[in-house]
From Swiss-Prot:
Species this chain originates from: Caenorhabditis elegans
Domain of life: Eukaryota
GO cellular component terms listed in the entry, alphabetical order: spliceosomal complex
Protein name as catalogued: Protein BUD31 homolog
Entry keyword Nucleus: yes
PROSITE patterns, A to Z: G10_1, G10_2
Subunit annotation: Identified in the spliceosome C complex.
Length: 147
């Protein structure tokens, strides 16, 4: 879905400062369209969605950084981005909590999706894992977001 379509769906004109973040969000939309149409021959079933998860993470991190770290956008614009689903509100809420600052996706901390009621392997600290083993999250392809 294009950026213009999402804006029409919100039925509200974007707040002041939109022109500052619009070009970057357009680039993320173009990357997302490219990742969605990318051929998936030769990939495992779980690997197909990994580029989409990465772009989604980057886009949410961009909006988060612009509001919380750099303070370059207003609260009104930040909330507009969340309601228009340009950024993932649940993921940003986790980033604000201690220990989840580098979380890759919300699926990795959702214990309902796992067989044993535990978090994803990418949430295990690297110091507690073998150095030779390559760890990849099944959900998003993360190599370890816990530190």
């Amino acid at each position: 879905m294009s950026l213009a379509t999402k804006l029409r769906r919100v039925r509200k004109s974007p707040p002041e400062g939109w022109d500052l973040i619009e070009p970057t969000l357009e680039q993320f939309e173009a990357k997302m369209r490219e990742a969605e149409t990318e051929p998936h021959e030769g990939k495992r079933k779980t690997e197909i969605n990994w580029p989409i998860f990465r772009i989604h993470h980057q886009r949410s991190r961009y909006v988060y950084d612009m509001y919380y770290k750099k303070a370059e956008i207003s609260r009104e614009l930040y909330e507009f981005c969340l309601t228009a689903k340009f950024a993932d509100a649940a993921l940003i809420a986790k980033w604000k909590k201690q220990g989840y600052e580098n979380l890759c996706c919300v699926k990795c901390v959702n214990t309902r999706d796992s067989n044993f009621g535990t978090a994803c392997i990418c949430r295990v600290p690297k110091s507690k894992l073998d150095a030779e083993r390559v760890i990849e999250c099944v959900h998003c392809g993360c190599h370890g977001c816990s530190g």
